[in-house]
């Protein structure tokens, strides 16, 4: 994929297309590094598919695959509701026509269930990812946002308190504060053999609240290895 990316003549690209090219190159480079570090090269921790391109052949819509352990739901309807874990999560990224600009932020939406206070679990906006953060500006790179979502999935980063910028899903946030943190469920290892660690009593509801983040290039919507 890097060969395809490098064939573009940057002098012939508009400012927007040059930005799309740069974002693509950074994402692809991140993917290559993750693939090289993976125990199974066919299953890197993050991979991508290009779902849509513009007239210049530059990506305007991606599908990101995360292969990490994360919470995808809870058991039962009454407390204590233990977490249900999954290991493959798919998220779409749509870059609007006015991207990049303050009013043209990328739209991140999970296509698989994710149980996280900053990701909508149900309803008409199901899967929507809230990336508001005081330490990341509106012009944060696509690569940095993809890594931020990886931190979300691992529960290394979350905002469950009912304070600005407010949780995206209040039901999940309440579960985090009242059930998950007291039971240590927000601190789960990626290694299945390692038991969960108890929560820090002094950090309840503040996982940055909890803070401690790629992929495979594609051709014709098929994941390639490099």
Question: What annotation goes with each model-predicted range?
Answer:
Residues 1-88, 98-226:
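UBC/E2-like fold recognition across ubiquitin and ubiquitin-like conjugation systems
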Residues 95:
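Short, conserved beta-strand/beta-arch hydrophobic-aromatic motifs that form part
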């Amino acid at each position: 994929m890097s060969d395809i990316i490098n064939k573009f003549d940057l002098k012939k690209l508009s400012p927007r297309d040059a930005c799309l090219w740069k974002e693509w190159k950074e994402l692809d480079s991140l993917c290559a590094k993750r693939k090289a570090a993976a125990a199974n090269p066919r299953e890197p921790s993050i991979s991508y598919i290009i779902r849509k391109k513009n007239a210049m052949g530059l990506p305007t819509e991606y599908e990101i695959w995360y292969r990490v352990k994360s919470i995808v739901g809870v058991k039962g309807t009454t407390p204590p509701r233990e977490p249900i874990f999954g290991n493959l999560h798919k998220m779409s990224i749509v870059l609007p026509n006015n991207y990049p600009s303050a009013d043209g932020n990328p739209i991140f939406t999970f296509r698989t269930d994710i149980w996280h206070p900053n990701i909508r679990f149900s309803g008409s906006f199901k899967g929507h990812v809230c990336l508001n953060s005081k330490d990341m500006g509106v012009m944060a790179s696509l690569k940095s946002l993809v890594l931020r979502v990886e931190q979300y999935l691992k529960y290394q980063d979350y905002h469950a308190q009912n304070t600005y910028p407010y949780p995206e899903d209040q039901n999940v946030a309440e579960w985090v504060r009242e059930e998950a943190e007291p039971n240590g469920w927000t601190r789960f290892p990626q290694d299945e053999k390692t038991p969960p660690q108890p929560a820090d009593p002094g950090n309840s509801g503040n996982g940055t609240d909890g803070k401690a983040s790629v992929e495979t290039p594609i051709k014709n919507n098929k994941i390639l290895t490099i």
